[in-house]
Amino acid sequence: FNSTPDVPLLLFWTLSILCLYKAIFEDKKWFWIIAGITMGLAFNSKYTALLLQIGVLAFLIFSSKYRKLLISPWLWMGLVISVVITFPVWWWNYQNEFASFAFQSSERTSSIGKFEIKPTLFFGAVGHQLFLLLPVLFSICIVFSYKHIKKALTKFTLPSQKTLFLLAFFIPTFIGFFLISPVYWVKLNWMMPSYITGIIIAGMYISKKLLKAQLIISIVFHIAVASQVVFYFVPIKSDDTWLGWKELGEKVEKVSENDSEAFIFSIDGYKTSAQLRFFSTKTVFAQNVINQPALQFDYLGDIMDDYKGKNAFYIDSDKRYKNKEKLGELPQMITPYFESYVELDPIIVDEGTIKERKFWVFYCKNYQPKK
């Protein structure tokens, strides 16, 4: 079974909100404990879940009726339990120089800190959220966010307690990511948790006419997407596709039969290497071969010095595939790590179909790791 972290995040985010609702509005104290467990599991899935604790505390601070719960031992017991549940994440980070925390915080905040405003990033975020929610629902989310924020800032008026509760888990994520989008690329899935409560609020605003329009657009959109999935009308010029990876793994196995001791590597981020590691029995690496950060490949226990003197097969996808010609030369960043290389014929998967993809192949000799 293979999954992105967003799947368990959305599951435990939803369960956390349900439990917090019962704990607060139905005064079922044991649900604070369950909420603590689910919030912890949500954080273990993805660090975005920290916004759950922030959301519940923000709600209680702004809620005149339920502010008294800030001194409730049940609230703090739930929060402590949520931290305890995250212990495996903290322990792993402690053992690995806080690598995942650094990746999610310092590396990304340094990019944001440069504060280079790029309108294309903002409009890109708007575009992919329009794609995710479709125009009617997305527009309603924008409208009610504006109305509630305007009332709070100009009239110091807050909505009903239950609406405020829903907003506490929507506004920080939805507005927060849009605020940083002009200076940092916000990915399509980052705002998804906010829509768990955001869509409920949208239901309070949508008219029957708009609901009908959303339904029609949704049906047309899903038919179009399903047709693309089944018939693949439009080729995807990217590694962001599920097509061809299994066949690539099989063909790489065949190409490497002449040197069974050779390892496989790619340096295009992590996708090609990750797919080959999944679909191949060969030893597969990423940028760690050339002494560069390689995300998860840095923590699989491999010591590159152990592969000194071995040969390797370098695999790289031709994302803008136009012909079946060879690349011509090995990328310069790789050549210092090998004595010599020979370019082999490219691997073509799903040949003769619209799904056809191309991968360059180099046979690199005598690996010399460097510090």
Predicted regions and their residues:
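Short acidic/glycine- and proline-prone juxtamembrane loop motifs at membrane-interface regions
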Residues: 1-8
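Transmembrane alpha-helices of multi-pass, membrane-embedded glycan-processing enzymes
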Residues: 9-12, 16, 131, 198
